[in-house]
A protein has these predicted regions:
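Active-site-proximal loop/turn and secondary-structure-junction residues that shape catalytic pockets
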Residues: 87, 242-244, 252, 291-293, ...
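Extracellular "leader-to-stem" segments immediately downstream of a signal peptide or signal-anchor
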Residues: 2-82, 87-100, 104-219, 224-226, ...
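Extracellular beta-rich repeat passengers
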Residues: 326, 337, 346-469
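Short, small-residue-enriched loops and turns at beta-alpha junctions
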Residues: 55-57, 294-298, 328-329, 355
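Right-handed parallel beta-helix
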Residues: 105-106, 142-150, 221-231, 244-256, ...
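Short glycine/acidic-rich loop motifs that flank beta-strands on beta-rich extracellular proteins
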Residues: 78, 92, 112-113, 155-159, ...
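Short, surface-exposed basic-aromatic patches at helix termini and helix-loop junctions that form
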Residues: 93-102, 241, 328, 356-357
Length: 469
């Protein structure tokens, strides 16, 4: 009897995060076998950030309070770090095993405008690490979650360069009122030499290297991000990398439409991932699959067993994207019942020599699009990352290493009301082949199809229509 009581107490003390959702329903009637991800298991210990010296007054820096609360929970084997309503200014947050960062309604975590608060410093020498430090991070951890109804604000405008062509006169004036530096041509504003915040490097180019992602999990297992709003990250909003068992459910991601590298959800070389019920309005790609470039991508491995359903993407460079770097490959991906409204492209497959890999078992079905400003479905194999100040390489396609191999992709039941072009594919021989697109309705404004002869795409029962001429 004593053993039974102890077992029951242990069961009550350690509980799996309840997602208030039957995730099993997303794993029925699949065209490819996908394992269902394992939810994180979090001990039922509770700590409030307020009990660790935290203040939600919008003035106090809470970096030490978050570190203290996480350390306290970690010593107990994990638990829930509760953040009540308030505005919590902070620097870097590092999560540990078996911890749930829970934001209650009207709780706002805001990352500091002072870039020094978001740069890792060597504890021995006091020197800055010469790389960007992700605002919320976990490395080689298991059973991690970020949940609740609150907001995480990346304060991205203090980090990102802005192109003059992408802002109004009023917005351009507002940026200049922050101080900063304007390029000699007057076409770029940099958050360098700001009025109220110090530089963290001697040049604009060096400071750009410190621009960070909002949330990054690396080599972790059993991750849940649910319910929260991710706002205005300096770079990508969330990027799990080489992780297994990842669920991203019901989050809102929002940043300015012109936010450089403002990707919403990027999955990099991960296995067993479920992405459902999210709403995205991003500055760059919406839901993007990555797999590393070159040898490092091959070593990291493919994105594998990815299930993407019931999401809505508003502005983004692409609603669903593969690339540009995926040398590790893409395998067993389902994209079903998603809506894209106002994205630059709907389904976007982009890569280039030295960045490409092989796709296998990619199934895309029942996608609904309206007001697509560019192509509804697009394949490109000469993509280059046009970041601020970049110059396109002259010999980008000369050496045939890590060549894109877009193949075994099956697209069906895509319904488009309004796009510039329907289906576009540009690539050299062997880069785009064994693609099927069938049973679709595409209402376009300029061109139904623009497919190179080298691209082997089978288009079946696709109804193209446009305005009467």
């Amino acid at each position: 009897m004593k053993k039974i009581i102890i077992s029951l107490l242990a069961l009550l003390a350690v509980t799996a995060i309840q997602a208030n959702n039957d995730y099993a329903k997303y794993y029925q009637n699949l065209p490819v076998q996908l394992p269902q991800p394992t939810l994180p298991t979090i001990p039922d210990n509770q700590v409030s950030i307020l009990d660790c010296g935290g203040k939600g007054d919008g003035l106090t820096l809470n970096t030490e309070a978050f570190a203290k609360a996480i350390s306290q929970l970690s010593k107990q084997g994990g638990g829930h770090l509760n953040v009540p309503a308030g505005i919590y200014l902070t620097g870097l947050i590092s999560l540990k095993d078996n911890i749930d960062l829970h934001l209650e309604k009207n709780a706002i975590i805001v990352f500091s405008e002072d870039k020094n608060d978001l740069i890792k410093v060597d504890k021995t020498t006091g020197a800055k690490e010469l790389r960007a430090a992700t605002a919320i991070t976990a490395s080689k951890r298991k059973n991690i979650s970020i949940t609740g109804e609150g907001t995480i604000d990346g304060n991205g405008e203090w980090w990102r360069a802005v192109k003059r062509s992408k802002v109004s006169d009023v917005e351009w004036k507002q940026f200049q009122e922050m101080g900063g530096s304007v390029s000699a041509k007057g076409d770029l504003w940099y958050p360098f030499n700001l009025k109220h915040q110090p530089n963290v490097a001697s040049t604009m180019e060096e400071q750009e290297k410190y621009r960070n992602h909002m949330i990054r999990f690396t080599d972790c297992q059993n991750i849940l991000v649910q319910g929260v709003t991710l706002l205005n990250s300096p770079r990508f909003h969330i990027i799990p990398t080489r992780c297994q068992n990842v669920i991203i459910d019901g989050i809102n991601v929002k940043c300015p439409w012109n936010a450089q590298n403002g990707d919403a959800i990027d999955i990099s070389s991960c296995k067993d991932v479920l992405i459902v019920n999210n709403v995205i309005d991003a500055g760059d790609d919406g839901i993007c699959m990555k797999g590393g470039a070159g040898e490092s991508g091959v070593k990291a491995g493919p994105c594998e067993n990815i299930n993407i359903q019931d999401n809505t993407v508003y502005h983004a460079h692409g609603g669903f994207v593969i690339g540009s770097e995926f040398s590790g490959g893409m395998k067993n991906i389902l994209v079903r019942n998603n809506t894209f409204q106002g994205t630059d492209a709907g389904l976007r497959f982009k890569s280039a020599v030295k960045r490409g890999g092989k796709t296998e078992n990619i199934f895309i079905d029942h996608i609904y699009m309206t007001d697509i400003t560019g192509d509804a479905i697009t394949f490109e194999t000469t993509y280059w990352d046009n970041h601020v100040g970049a110059k396109q390489p002259k010999n980008a396609v000369q050496k045939a290493e890590f060549v894109p191999n877009f193949q075994d992709i099956h697209i069906s039941n895509v319904y488009v009301r309004g796009c510039k072009n329907g289906i576009v594919a540009h690539g050299q021989e062997g880069m785009i082949h064994d693609i099927t697109i069938k049973d679709c309705n595409i209402f376009y404004n300029k061109q139904a199809q623009d497919i190179d002869k080298a691209c082997k795409i089978q288009v079946e029962n696709v109804n193209f229509s446009t305005f009467a001429k």
